[in-house]
Amino acid sequence: MSEDGDICPICKSSRYLNPDMKFLVNPQCYHKMCESCVDRLFAYGPVTCPHNGCEKILRKNKFKTQIFEDVAVEKEVDVRQRVMSVMNKREDEFDTLNDYNAYLEKIEDSIFTLLNGTADEKDALTKEIEAYEKEHKAEIIANNKLRDEEDKYEQQKEDWMKEQRKANYLMAVEEQRAAQEDKEAAKRELVHQLATSNKDASSIEQNVQKTALKRSSARTVNFQPMPTSRYFEKVKKESSKPETPFTPFNGDRQIPALFEVQDHYDDKVIEPLAHDIQHQAGGFTLKAAYARILQQAFFGLGVDVQTELLAEENGNSNGTAVPVKTEEDPVKLEEPSIQVKVESTV
């Protein structure tokens, strides 16, 4: 005898006689009926629900397979998905954790009202959600897209972790098999040398153990387990401002330069290096060396790190603040005598 859950309430067909029969529900009223009844009753357009006392207008394309046996659970899951697809703000969009928790509580209150509220409360809340969805459509779409990307990332990470665990398991099995083979080979080698060699038994045993230890060490290097985690790049919201680290001293740049490099300086240390063939092969030039020395000497003059930080926080620059202007024109050096000790690393 079939249970009531296996009988279509419309056509009274039984799953006992038709094992392939599928039951469908419509989110409008969640009344169950078989797939054949849906095809037969709703083939020509929307029709009133055939259940006694239900006046909901149903459409064929809204029917779906019932996942949960309890219709109340099925309804709650659908309502929750609907509400959270619209009210989908993220924690980083709130100033404090309390604000985010209040937002989550509002979502739960909305779900409870749609499930257990009066008809007027449900209608009012439905209109409110529809108005919010219309007003924040672009934001909702962006958050849903970001959530899908994060779900995809988590799935990829989980799949990768499974592959790594499987690979590590196979590698451990292979390592264990190789260790057993080496152990048996060492025993055979020990017996063979004891039978054929004239050396002392203790020295033979030590030599065999050393050989086995070398093989074991080499095998351990070859069978290193793969890491069980990977640095996955988290999906982040796109921003017009590049997320680059802050570097002081005007972004490691000094524009305009506070010096001019002359063609010649009286320097007895660096000048001989220009005639060294080893330095010439590496692209060494006197002017480049002098420019580097002067840059190090003048680097950071007129730059206020605190001013740069303030400009960075206020968004007035891209991490590069204009240094404090100290003179109208760059400093011109009239062939100073620069005594710098340079040690060649070549």
UniProtKB/Swiss-Prot annotation:
GO annotation, cellular component aspect: transcription factor TFIIH holo complex; transcription factor TFIIK complex
InterPro entries: Cdk-activating_kinase_MAT1_cen, MAT1/Tfb3, Znf_RING, Znf_RING/FYVE/PHD, Znf_RING_CS
UniProt keywords, alphabetically: Metal-binding, Nucleus, Transcription, Transcription regulation, Zinc, Zinc-finger
GO molecular function: cyclin-dependent protein serine/threonine kinase activator activity; zinc ion binding
Organism: Yarrowia lipolytica (strain CLIB 122 / E 150) (Yeast)
Name of protein: RNA polymerase II transcription factor B subunit 3
Gene3D superfamilies reported in the protein's UniProt record: Zinc/RING finger domain, C3HC4 (zinc finger)
Region of interest (Disordered), ranges: 314-346
Basic and acidic residues biased stretches: 325-335
Subcellular location: Nucleus
Biological-process GO terms, alphabetical: DNA repair; nucleotide-excision repair; regulation of transcription by RNA polymerase II
Functional summary from the UniProt entry: Acts as a component of the general transcription and DNA repair factor IIH (TFIIH or factor B), which is essential for both basal and activated transcription, and is involved in nucleotide excision repair (NER) of damaged DNA. TFIIH as CTD kinase activity and DNA-dependent ATPase activity, and is essential for polymerase II transcription.
Residues passing through the membrane, by range: none
Pfam families linked to this entry: MAT1, zf-C3HC4_5
Zn-finger region bounds: RING-type: 8-53
